[in-house]
Amino acid sequence: MNAPHTHDTVADGAAIEATVADIADTGRRALTRREQKEAYENNKLFKRIVRQVGQAIGDYNMIEQGDKVMVCLSGGKDSYAMLDVLLRLRERAPIDFDIVAVNLDQKQPGFPEHVLPEYLTQIGVPFHIENQDTYSIVKRLVPEGKTTCSLCSRLRRGILYRVAGELGATKIALGHHRDDILQTLLLNMFYGGKLKGMPPKLQSDDGRNVVIRPLAYVKETDLEKFAELREFPIIPCNLCGSQPNLKRAEMKALIRDWDKRFPGRVDNMFSALANVVPSHLMDTTQFPFASLRATGQADPQGDIAFDEEPCASGDDTATRDGARPISIVQFDDL
């Protein structure tokens, strides 16, 4: 593992946190109205992302005292942003935890091996580069024209679990965001026939690791703006990202279309993931339908058999009794 000698935490965030006050020092000019607005919006964006990540960590107890968090860094916008924000939060956190960045070099042709080591050394973050030629394995085993995501993901997952053990990491942080979670929900509904999303925190399938997703509440569009603002040295994925006709790409386009044409719909979908009512679904493993009997006592979650659901009227503000909205989606500054 490489441990740089410098120990600066987050790379200088002055551009993001710049105030809109007059900066007319000697030889400098005041900000124009447009520049003031841009600085203000950039500052709001940064604070919003930090707040959302902090809330997700708190809501799901993602990081605890003494944790060693292995931040999986792919070189994409999401993982860069996750590392950047976690470093920032660590400065203010009431607990102590360590961060180590890990990149899996899958030996894709043209992969710029120098980019991540240089970046991580510059910002003073300990890191480990794991070299494994999964690219050749995937290209050999997956027929031409078929998507490589499934096999690539399985290989990558196994390697990262092993590396986490070798490094003594107690948490594995992945850069999936709100849109990824919703896309997974729709993919499972449309093509898998099940109500299954992507949890903010889970035990790994090998039973040895806890995986966390600190960006769970963050919109992808915000991460795109943030990455551009921070000028992260983005490394494009030419193995899976360029594959045409991916079902996930269809879900992404669908969600963005809904978000544009029906304001609030996507926020409500996301909120629904934390407002599950098993008694009003059809899974007999989640609710004892077979043994259900009339108790003679009123039940606020009971079926209003002959009434229309409040939301059926088109009133998006209606909330079923007992529903627990995710407060983070009620943004006041979006």
From Swiss-Prot:
<dbReference type="Pfam" id="PF01171">
    <property type="entry name" value="ATP_bind_3"/>
</dbReference>
<keyword id="KW-0408">Iron</keyword>
<feature type="short sequence motif" description="PP-loop motif">
    <location>
        <begin position="74"/>
        <end position="79"/>
    </location>
</feature>
<dbReference type="InterPro" id="IPR014729">
    <property type="entry name" value="Rossmann-like_a/b/a_fold"/>
</dbReference>
<dbReference type="GO" id="GO:0000049">
    <property type="term" value="F:tRNA binding"/>
</dbReference>
<comment type="subunit">
    <text>Homodimer.</text>
</comment>
<keyword id="KW-0547">Nucleotide-binding</keyword>
<comment type="pathway">
    <text>tRNA modification.</text>
</comment>
<dbReference type="GO" id="GO:0005524">
    <property type="term" value="F:ATP binding"/>
</dbReference>
<dbReference type="InterPro" id="IPR011063">
    <property type="entry name" value="TilS/TtcA_N"/>
</dbReference>
<keyword id="KW-0479">Metal-binding</keyword>
<keyword id="KW-0067">ATP-binding</keyword>
<keyword id="KW-0694">RNA-binding</keyword>
<dbReference type="GO" id="GO:0034227">
    <property type="term" value="P:tRNA thio-modification"/>
</dbReference>
<comment type="function">
    <text>Catalyzes the ATP-dependent 2-thiolation of cytidine in position 32 of tRNA, to form 2-thiocytidine (s(2)C32). The sulfur atoms are provided by the cysteine/cysteine desulfurase (IscS) system.</text>
</comment>
<keyword id="KW-0963">Cytoplasm</keyword>
<keyword id="KW-0004">4Fe-4S</keyword>
<keyword id="KW-0411">Iron-sulfur</keyword>
<dbReference type="GO" id="GO:0005737">
    <property type="term" value="C:cytoplasm"/>
</dbReference>
<comment type="similarity">
    <text>Belongs to the TtcA family.</text>
</comment>
<dbReference type="GO" id="GO:0016783">
    <property type="term" value="F:sulfurtransferase activity"/>
</dbReference>
<keyword id="KW-0808">Transferase</keyword>
<feature type="binding site">
    <location>
        <position position="240"/>
    </location>
    <ligand>
        <name>[4Fe-4S] cluster</name>
    </ligand>
</feature>
<dbReference type="InterPro" id="IPR012089">
    <property type="entry name" value="tRNA_Cyd_32_2_STrfase"/>
</dbReference>
<dbReference type="GO" id="GO:0051539">
    <property type="term" value="F:4 iron, 4 sulfur cluster binding"/>
</dbReference>
<feature type="binding site">
    <location>
        <position position="149"/>
    </location>
    <ligand>
        <name>[4Fe-4S] cluster</name>
    </ligand>
</feature>
<dbReference type="GO" id="GO:0000287">
    <property type="term" value="F:magnesium ion binding"/>
</dbReference>
<keyword id="KW-0819">tRNA processing</keyword>
<keyword id="KW-0460">Magnesium</keyword>
<feature type="binding site">
    <location>
        <position position="152"/>
    </location>
    <ligand>
        <name>[4Fe-4S] cluster</name>
    </ligand>
</feature>
<protein>
    <recommendedName>
        <fullName>tRNA-cytidine(32) 2-sulfurtransferase</fullName>
        <ecNumber>2.8.1.-</ecNumber>
    </recommendedName>
</protein>
<keyword id="KW-0820">tRNA-binding</keyword>
